[in-house]
Swiss-Prot record:
UniProt keywords, alphabetically: Chaperone, Chromatin regulator, DNA replication, Nucleus, Repeat, Repressor, Transcription, Transcription regulation, WD repeat
Organism of provenance: Gallus gallus
Ranges for region Interaction with HAT1: 359-404
InterPro entries: G-protein_beta_WD-40_rep (IPR020472), Histone-bd_RBBP4-like_N (IPR022052), WD40/YVTN_repeat-like_dom_sf (IPR015943), WD40_repeat_CS (IPR019775), WD40_repeat_dom_sf (IPR036322), WD40_rpt (IPR001680), WD_repeat_RBAP46/RBAP48/MSI1 (IPR050459)
UniProt function note: Core histone-binding subunit that may target chromatin remodeling factors, histone acetyltransferases and histone deacetylases to their histone substrates in a manner that is regulated by nucleosomal DNA. Component of several complexes which regulate chromatin metabolism.
UniProt repeat feature WD, residue ranges: 47-121, 127-172, 180-216, 227-268, 274-311, 317-368, 375-402
One Pfam family this sequence matches: WD40
Keyword Protein biosynthesis (UniProt): no
Quaternary structure and partners: Binds directly to helix 1 of the histone fold of histone H4, a region that is not accessible when H4 is in chromatin. Also interacts with histone H2B and HAT1.
Listed Gene3D superfamilies: YVTN repeat-like/Quinoprotein amine dehydrogenase (2.130.10.10)
Encoding gene, per UniProt annotation: RBBP7
Name of the protein this chain belongs to: Histone-binding protein RBBP7
Biological process per Gene Ontology, one example term: DNA replication
A GO molecular-function annotation: histone binding
GO cellular component: chromosome, telomeric region; cytosol; ESC/E(Z) complex; nucleus; NuRD complex; NURF complex
Length: 424
């Protein structure tokens, strides 16, 4: 039995390796930017910070990322890293590095990704998210039940060698660990967290700690009957949020309700565990959920009884789903199949040739195939449209942007230019 499993693993490794070679060979045609960086330890979490700096006279901009570590028994850290991304006009396909499968003029740009701040953390960082109203404040999910809050301006850039973790706040309320974490973009300091203990906790950190650094949950929502995988505030309504769980349900909650045990809406969303959700930043009624049933579902809050659409192409569980911050119809999803799919809602139902249909449905805009292990998290860059950072379980972090001709299908207006000066 064991030898059969070993054989299967070897075959899978060979397939992954072959697929990666093909991907690497094709990157100049598929991307305007690819940076591959091996982290010292894998990160389970990634999020771009909102700041960008464009140094005068330089051919790049500086961006920042929040990462974490997942070590094998060594000290863990919350990490803020600085990234140099070349300006659009610097993307030069002739700079392609076939060995690394990288290009974008990066051979010449040294020190493109550097760790700026490392803060001691209790166990691995399951997830880290910054507070929109003050991006220096970062909340983290730990292997314990506590949620930690750090103001990274109050910590030295190099961690204390003792390994002591010294968060600015410790949020109590859960009995077990989890992953889901969401700051309210309309109410400063309001944080939601999802947990394996079947609950969602809400804290208001602006109220400050009662004693020491401990803040107790303001409310605990108990509607789910299994592990709650993810939670997200609505982006426009300050009192609405959604949660998804292993009970296969999507629940919509209103914090103004006088009950915390019953959601406003509960939907059987998928045929397996629901792992993630994301509200559309442009359309107040639209949200998406991702599931172990390998699909992403599209929902309208005005009629949750009816699933608007099911996106099908992933070969395994989906763990992340995020709408683009720049395009109302663009959505991306990733997970266990090592692929990050970018979808375009505006293409749903378009006619396809039989050949194109073999590659996936018309709404599947792009498949990022650069990872050779499960993707743990990804983040859309808020300042550079179409730039995504994705991290996988094998320590690899990739910062990439698909080729413009893939998402910009308008034909270049050559005819008009040719006609200029020809009279009418």
């Amino acid at each position: 039995m064991a030898s059969k499993e070993v054989l299967e693993d070897t075959v899978e490794e060979r397939v992954i390796s072959e697929e990666y070679k093909i991907w690497k060979k094709n990157t100049p045609f598929l991307y305007d930017l690819v940076m591959t960086h091996a982290l010292e330890w894998p990160s389970l979490t990634v999020q771009w910070l909102p700041d960008v700096s464009r140094p005068e006279g330089k051919d790049y901009a500086l961006h920042w990322l929040v990462l974490g570590t997942h070590t094998s028994d060594e000290q863990n850290h919350l990490v803020v890293a600085r990234v140099q991304i070349p300006n659009d006009d610097q993307f030069d396909t002739s700079q392609y590095d076939s060995e690394k499968g990288e290009f974008g003029g990066f051979g010449s740009v040294t020190g493109k990704i550097e760790t700026e701040i490392k803060i001691n953390h209790e166990g691995e960082v399951n997830r880290a998210r910054y507070m929109p109203q003050n991006p220096y404040i970062i909340a983290t999910k730990t292997p314990s039940a506590d949620v930690l809050v750090f103001d990274y301006t109050k910590h030295p850039s190099k961690p204390d060698p003792s390994g002591e973790c010294n968060p600015d706040l410790r949020l109590r309320g859960h009995q077990k660990e989890g992953y889901g974490l969401s700051w309210n973009s309309n109410l400063k300091g309001h944080l939601l967290s999802a947990s394996d203990d079947h609950t969602v906790c809400l804290w208001d950190i602006s109220a400050g700690p009662k004693e020491g650094k401990i803040v107790d949950a303001k409310a605990i929502f108990t509607g789910h009957s299994a592990v709650v995988e993810d939670v997200a505030w609505h982006l426009l309504h300050e009192s609405l949020f959604g949660s998804v769980a292993d009970d296969q349900k999507l629940m919509i909650w209103d914090t103004r309700s006088n009950t915390t045990s019953k959601p406003s809406h509960s939907v059987d969303a998928h045929t397996a565990e629901v792992n993630c959700l994301s509200f559309n930043p442009y359309s107040e009624f639209i949200l998406a959920t991702g599931s172990a049933d390998k699909t992403v579902a599209l929902w309208d809050l005005r009629n949750l009884k009816l699933k608007l659409h099911s996106f099908e192409s992933h070969k395994d569980e989906i763990f992340q789903v995020h709408w683009s911050p720049h395009n109302e119809t663009i959505l991306a999803s990733s997970g266990t199949d090592r692929r990050l799919n970018v979808w375009d809602l505006s293409k749903i139902g378009e006619e396809q040739s039989a050949e194109d249909a073999e590659d996936g449905p018309p709404e599947l805009l792009f498949i990022h195939g650069g990872h050779t292990a499960k993707i743990s998290d990804f983040s859309w860059n808020p300042n550079e449209p179409w730039v995504i950072c994705s991290v996988s379980e094998d320590n690899i972090m990739q910062i990439w942007q698909m080729a413009e001709n893939i998402y910009n299908d308008e034909e270049p207006d050559i005819a008009a230019a040719e006609l200029e000066g020809q009279g009418t």
